[in-house]
């Protein structure tokens, strides 16, 4: 998760079709999209300079020729009332702050989780093992639930956990797993406890909660459920772009995607005299799905919401949106009050509230169950 940028873009942006390949072939270049149709070729170093200045982007270097970003999404009817309160409340009762603290302590202990580093590969492997353990412990694997790697052209892989339902329509919850030290991406210490270890372990604990429901475990939910952990988000939403482009090409149907990017920091709100709240992202999301998310929060969570905007390509929900799938995003706070330690070696567990992270986990359990069951 990053702040909306007011950075003035020095180079002239061009359309994707008009973006010529850079002449200098000695330095690797990447094609990035800073706004719809506005692209530029940059070096890896220039990528991180943009990030340090708060400018988000899609890295579209490997985008298929002929790809067209979705300008509209198919209409989806979302529930307008709560239907599974007893089941959701039973699952919520099993959520554990202790589990999240244990998992985040381990996940943030990797030197970094940079998408090109061995640490990024090791952390993804460890995370996938925890997902597999949750599935196996629930017995859902006996009914077709599974976890799989989604490989990329860099060493860190994305992770997809699938709990089959009666239909192939998919309800997705996602979070990016990588971290970055903005000053030294490859070798710098980047615990990434909040950005985005918090989101990664929050959805992991929510998965454990969802797997307490035998209807879901036994594949009897109306829709299929997927939990995603994306690789390479910091480098331009690489993992989520690849997955949702693959889904688009395969003709998969996604009923809704909820993104969790930074779920643990509340000090910024409290210091401003605000109540602890969710930050509801209102730009580059599906309005109807966001309305549904508000209903889930009001029913199952104990904190209010504040509307906020995060800008173009700010996190992985934008990849779903760009490929024509309805998405929503809920952050730990309004964007201007996010954790100031992100992308540094001080993004540690010490600054986080696990009570707040439990609120996010409750949201996820409610979202998945009300939409899939």
Curated annotation (Swiss-Prot):
It is an enzyme of class 3 (hydrolase). One of its GO terms (cellular component) is extracellular region. Glycans are attached at residues 196, 286. Keywords: Aminopeptidase, Disulfide bond, Glycoprotein, Hydrolase, Metal-binding, Protease, Secreted, Signal, Virulence, Zinc. One of its GO terms (molecular function) is aminopeptidase activity. Binds 2 Zn(2+) ions per subunit. Residues 1-18 form the signal peptide. One of its GO terms (biological process) is proteolysis. Disulfide bonds join 310-314. It is found in: Secreted. PANTHER family: AMINOPEPTIDASE YDR415C-RELATED (PTHR12147:SF56), METALLOPEPTIDASE M28 FAMILY MEMBER (PTHR12147). Monomer. Extracellular aminopeptidase which contributes to pathogenicity. This is Leucine aminopeptidase 1. It comes from Arthroderma otae (strain ATCC MYA-4605 / CBS 113480). The lineage of its organism: Eukaryota, Fungi, Dikarya, Ascomycota, Pezizomycotina. The gene is LAP1.
